[in-house]
């Protein structure tokens, strides 16, 4: 593995790169946070300095997303996978059902976890039939009668697909795993009852999950809920029911301020769409590389591509790593390549990758 004395372009799907200026700010405050004489890592979660960090981060997030007051914002410990259990526990009672769109591995895992405890849950779409290259159009007619909610994964990191527009439902609340795209574009927030996201793509370090839910649509359920999965309990305690991942919350807060300085989600969406278009255009015009995802379903966060000559794959990855392009190997179950170009990936990183791909094709095509 090569060694570098400078920052490289990190295309890993997650944990992913953070904005350099956020890292620099965290570095400057690491040993002595704003005159406290200690690091945020050492700080009690019960004292005023951390409470200020927590409150500011939530306030900034609310501003970025234009959240109505009825929506709660809660930080949960652990990864988004914990919410695969927490959501059914909070929204289903014994005998209840809900609907899932199985658009990839993570939606399938969430479905299987819910079905362990609530055997009546249903799938309304199985993307395995198209090798997860397509997404459904979901309307009220798609949703089963009696479904307590409709669950989607908004962006699929493994396959490079996403919903360009979201379902607008009256029949059932919409719940979305947005781990790999939250804060990358504007959202019609009031169309969702729950949005959750692991932090490690666009928010901050791993080990933290953000849950946003409509308090008016949180039902009373007929069973006890484990404390660290209980939405109402965690919200009542201000994300401090237990010791939270304090440093991850601090970094998330710095990221939110960075996004505000950049102009908010409208600017991020414009930038991300431009980055993705550049890369897809380069792939589509290549005679060596190709993108397997149909245009209407292509993700702006995770650009999946392959080679017509898979005998060159290992050479491409090796040379890419040597030249400072990390994390381009595709997910282990699908192979090929994947460039994750989250908010923190600068446009010049995409431009540099395109130049490298073109040079590789000239030398090996």
From Swiss-Prot:
- Give the sites modified to N6-(pyridoxal phosphate)lysine: 201
Report the HAMAP family cross-referenced here: SerC_aminotrans_5 (MF_00160)
Q: Where does this protein come from, organism-wise?
A: Leptospira biflexa serovar Patoc (strain Patoc 1 / ATCC 23582 / Paris)
Record localization: Cytoplasm
Q: What is the lineage of its organism?
A: Bacteria, Pseudomonadati, Spirochaetota, Spirochaetia, Leptospirales
Q: What does this protein do?
A: Catalyzes the reversible conversion of 3-phosphohydroxypyruvate to phosphoserine and of 3-hydroxy-2-oxo-4-phosphonooxybutanoate to phosphohydroxythreonine.
Q: How is the cofactor bound?
A: Binds 1 pyridoxal phosphate per subunit.
Q: How does it assemble?
A: Homodimer.
Instruction: Identify the residues that bind L-glutamate.
Output: 46
The enzyme's E.C. designation:
2.6.1.52
Q: Which Pfam families match?
A: Aminotran_5
Catalytic reaction equation(s): O-phospho-L-serine + 2-oxoglutarate = 3-phosphooxypyruvate + L-glutamate; 4-(phosphooxy)-L-threonine + 2-oxoglutarate = (R)-3-hydroxy-2-oxo-4-phosphooxybutanoate + L-glutamate
Q: Where does pyridoxal 5'-phosphate bind?
A: 80-81, 106, 157, 177, 200, 242-243
- GO BP field: L-serine biosynthetic process; pyridoxine biosynthetic process
* Enzyme class label: transferase
This protein's pathway reads:
Amino-acid biosynthesis; L-serine biosynthesis; L-serine from 3-phospho-D-glycerate: step 2/3; Cofactor biosynthesis; pyridoxine 5'-phosphate biosynthesis; pyridoxine 5'-phosphate from D-erythrose 4-phosphate: step 3/5
Signal peptide location: none
What one GO molecular function would you report for this record? O-phospho-L-serine:2-oxoglutarate aminotransferase activity
Q: Which cofactor does it need?
A: pyridoxal 5'-phosphate
Name of encoding gene: serC
Q: Quote the protein name from its UniProt record.
A: Phosphoserine aminotransferase
Which Gene Ontology cellular-component terms appear in the entry?
Answer: cytoplasm
């Amino acid at each position: 593995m090569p060694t570098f004395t400078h920052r490289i372009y990190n295309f890993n799907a997650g944990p992913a790169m953070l904005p350099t200026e956020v890292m620099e700010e965290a570095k400057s405050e690491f040993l002595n946070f704003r005159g406290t004489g200690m690091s945020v890592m050492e700080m009690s979660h019960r004292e005023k300095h951390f409470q200020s960090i927590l409150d500011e981060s939530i306030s900034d997030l609310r501003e970025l997303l234009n959240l109505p007051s009825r929506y709660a914002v809660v930080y949960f410990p652990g990864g988004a996978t914990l919410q695969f259990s927490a959501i059914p526990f909070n929204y289903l009672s014994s005998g209840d059902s809900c609907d899932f769109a199985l658009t990839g591995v993570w939606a399938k895992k969430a479905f299987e976890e819910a079905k362990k405890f609530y055997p009546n849950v249903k799938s309304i779409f199985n993307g395995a039939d198209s090798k997860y290259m397509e997404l459904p159009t979901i309307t009220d007619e798609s949703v089963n009668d009696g479904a307590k909610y409709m669950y989607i994964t908004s962006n699929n990191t493994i396959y490079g697909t996403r919903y360009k527009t979201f379902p607008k439902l009256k029949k059932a609340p919409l719940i979305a795993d947005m781990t790999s795209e939250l804060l990358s574009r504007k959202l019609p927030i009031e169309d969702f009852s729950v949005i959750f996201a692991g932090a490690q793509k666009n928010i901050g370090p791993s080990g933290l999950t953000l849950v946003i839910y409509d308090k008016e649509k949180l039902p009373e359920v007929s069973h006890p809920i484990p404390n660290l999965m209980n939405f109402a309990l965690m919200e009542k305690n201000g994300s401090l029911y237990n010791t939270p991942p304090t440093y991850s919350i601090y970094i998330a807060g710095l990221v939110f301020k960075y996004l505000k300085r950049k102009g908010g989600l409208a600017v991020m969406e414009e930038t991300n769409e431009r980055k993705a278009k550049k890369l897809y255009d380069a792939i589509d015009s290549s005679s060596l590389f190709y993108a397997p995802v149909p245009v209407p379903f292509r993700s702006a966060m995770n650009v999946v591509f392959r080679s017509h000559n898979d005998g060159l794959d290992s050479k491409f990855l090796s040379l890419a790593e040597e030249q400072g392009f990390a994390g381009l190997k595709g997910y282990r179950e699908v192979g090929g390549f994947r460039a994750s170009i989250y908010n923190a990936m600068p446009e010049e990183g995409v431009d540099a990758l395109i130049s490298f791909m073109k040079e590789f094709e000239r030398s090996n095509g």
